[in-house]
Every structure is written in structure tokens, then in C-alpha cells.
Amino acid sequence: MKIGLIGTGRIGAFHAQTLRGVPGVTGLVVADVDTARAAALADTLGVRAAPGIAEMYADGLDGVVITAATSAHATLIHQALDAGVPVFCEKPVAPDVAGTLGVVERARACGVPVQIGFQRRFDAGYRAAREALHSGELGWLHTLRACTSDRTPPPAGYIPTSGGLFRDCSIHDFDILRWLTGREVVSVYAQGANRGASFFADGDDVDTCAALLRFDDDTLATVTATRYNGAGHDVRLEVCGSEGARVVGLDDRAPLPSAEARLSWRRAAAPYATFMERFHDAYVTELEVFTEVAAGRVPSPCSPAEALDALYVAEACERSRRTGLPVAVAEVRTGAGGAAQGG
């Protein structure tokens, strides 16, 4: 199987290294608008760098992995669909709902599989919590508490194109909550704040946010995120039912010293520094699964339509943050012309 990879930045280089070790991948070719960067990565990994995207597809690909800049995702997905090549694309599908809708409709029409990179679906802890919930072991679900905390903030230049904290960061929680529960978010109430560097406010964004979500079965969830958690990268989820609970991410590398004098909690290693370190195994698994998708052996485990559903929740949270009012997710769907769209 020959795989192409477009975008050789940090996550692209990581995925390229991973793909070299995935069973069944016999060829890898990389491309980037920064041809020197692509050539350097190709030289490091002992693979080929294509001079451009057209030349990459001319080689004949069995699948393509898109890790380019967010603003290019939708265009690159459409190009892959034009070529009839199965696609893996890092989130988001597009910077906005309209662009995402366009990809959803096109992917459905042409039938070429597209997998979106919500890697938490492949994390062992989230999968175990989902299994415990759906087995009935936890009883009926009443509360979910999710947090995503970056150890250090991104560079100032990233903020204007990031989409904002809800769309860039919390969208992972919105996706995993829908996937884990099998339920839809019907309304949100969200707030945001800036306590750190001024470039967040200058970019019309926040560095810390919180949202209250209500699901269609009246389960409640809180989702918080911050760009400032110097103790370490911290991603957790509490799944609380009438008969039991599970916590994802509470391991011996969680940056959570106990305040209880009677408890001695010793870390086995330093806290996670980045999301790539925290979710290393999940990133590997999702690409292994993508090769199965590209081969036609399994359906896409995360379609553009599912990514759109998570984006609707993020859009509702952003609207709520700006207005200070609760927002029904249906209002966002309808306003986007997406009343019948999504998963």
C-alpha cells in the first residue's frame, strides 16, 4: 500500500514516522508547500518527497494523510476525492461550518472514504469507559466532566487562524462525549476568560473556557479548557452513572498532586508535556485503522458528518460565550442550512 502525506510540520512528521512502521504500508511519499521541509523529512526517513501534490497523485496512491495548515484542509480533501483516493485528515475538516458542509456533501456523493483525526476515539482509556457505560456497569448516566489543559500556550501567531478555544481545543471533548454516550447535545451555556497573555484577547479569543452541555436524554456535562496548565498537559474525563463511575486520564503521569495528607501519590514519570505525548498510542492506532479503511476492509470510524456534529456544538458554545446566553444546537444547525445534515 502506497500512502501520501501532505504537510510535514510537527504532526505531519510524527504521522510520517508512524506510517513507516504500519504493517502493509510499503511506500510513503511526502509533500509540502515548503518543499525544503518536505525534502528534509524525506531524507531523514528514507522516503520520497514529491515536488507537488499533482505529482504525488500521479504516482498512484492507495490513501492520503492530510496534516497541512487548517485553512487548506477542505481544498486538499476535495482534491483527494477528485482523484478517488481515500483520505485521512486531521481536524478540523474546514475552518467553518460552510466549508465542512461542502466536504460532508461531497464525500457522501462520491463514496470515497474520509476519516477525520479525532484521535481520542482510539485511546484505551476512553474506549474502556465507553464499554463500561454501554455494558450497564455504571447504571444510567447522569454527569460527565471533561477537561483539556495545555501545559503551555501556543505561539501568538497561531491564534488568529486557530478558530478559537472551543473550535480548536474543546471540540475534541465535544466529539468524544457524543461518541462515548451515543447521544446528541441539545443546548449549551458557555463562558470564556483571559488571565494570561494579551494576544488571546487581541485575536478575539480566550485562554480559558467552560461550557455546560445538556444532552437529549437530560445528561449534563461540563467541558473546561485552558492554555495555561504549567504542571503538565492534562486531559481527563469523569463518566458518572447511578451505579458507578470511570475516570479517563487519571494515571501516574497526571499532573494532580493530592491535597490530602493521608494519600501519597507518587508519579512513575514526569507529567505529559504535550498532546502528542499524551495520545501517542492513539495516534498510532488511528493510522493503523486508516490503512484498513483505505483498503476497503472497514468503514471510516469518524466521518466528516461526525466532525460536523462536533463543530455545531463548538459553534453553539462560541455563540453562547459572545452573547452570554444559552444556545440551542438546533439553532446553529438550522442557521447553517444544516437541519438535515450531520451524523
Show where each model-derived region lies.
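C-terminal helix-rich "cap/oligomerization" subdomain common to oxidoreductases
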Residues: 63-66, 101, 112, 216, ...
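Rossmann-like dinucleotide-binding domain that binds NAD(P)(H)
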Residues: 156-220, 225-231, 305
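Hydrophobic residues in well-ordered beta-strands that form the structural core
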Residues: 51, 89, 114-116, 145, ...
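NAD(P)-dinucleotide binding in Rossmann-like oxidoreductases
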Residues: 201-202, 216-285, 303
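Beta-loop-alpha module in the N-terminal Rossmann-like domain of NAD(P)-dependent dehydrogenases
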Residues: 15, 45-106
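A contiguous active-site-proximal alpha/beta segment in oxidoreductase catalytic domains
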Residues: 71, 94-155
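N-terminal Rossmann-like dinucleotide-binding module
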Residues: 1-45
